[in-house]
């Protein structure tokens, strides 16, 4: 699943499309979609992935302060797989986006293999 395909899929889920509008300046529309989603919940098989994001770009546009918590856990055992809360410089965003996408794709692949 590509990045664009993932977004198209997420935007078909009503619960994921109710983020409030916030006045934050981003470089691109894609960046805005990726980094601000309020509360987003996506169910995949027995796993639930929750993304919570609040972001602010400073007036000087040099730093991107992001508090992003990613919680992935098995709905049956409630075992938590991953959490993270970080502050990033804007120069780190592209690398982090790539890492998040790769991690999500690997998780999806691993889950699918479990059900083959």
PLM feature spans:
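Short acidic, low-complexity intrinsically disordered linear motifs used
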Residues: 98-116
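Short helix/turn-capping signatures at newly exposed starts of structured segments
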Residues: 1-7, 90-92, 99
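Negatively charged, low-complexity tracts enriched in Asp/Glu with abundant Ser/Thr
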Residues: 1-33
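Acidic, low-complexity, intrinsically disordered interaction modules
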Residues: 21-95
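Charged/polar, solvent-exposed surface patches and flexible loops
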Residues: 8, 12, 83, 106, ...
């Amino acid at each position: 699943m590509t990045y664009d395909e993932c977004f198209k899929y997420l935007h078909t889920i009503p619960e994921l499309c109710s983020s409030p509008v916030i006045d934050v300046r981003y470089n691109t529309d894609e960046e805005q979609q990726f980094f601000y989603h309020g509360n987003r919940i996506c169910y995949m098989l027995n796993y639930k992935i929750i993304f919570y994001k609040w972001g602010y770009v400073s007036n000087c546009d040099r730093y991107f302060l992001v508090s992003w918590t990613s919680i992935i856990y098995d709905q049956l055992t409630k075992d938590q797989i991953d959490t993270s809360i970080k502050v990033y410089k804007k120069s780190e965003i592209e690398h982090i986006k790539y890492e998040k996408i790769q991690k999500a794709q690997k998780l999806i692949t691993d889950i699918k293999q479990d059900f083959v």
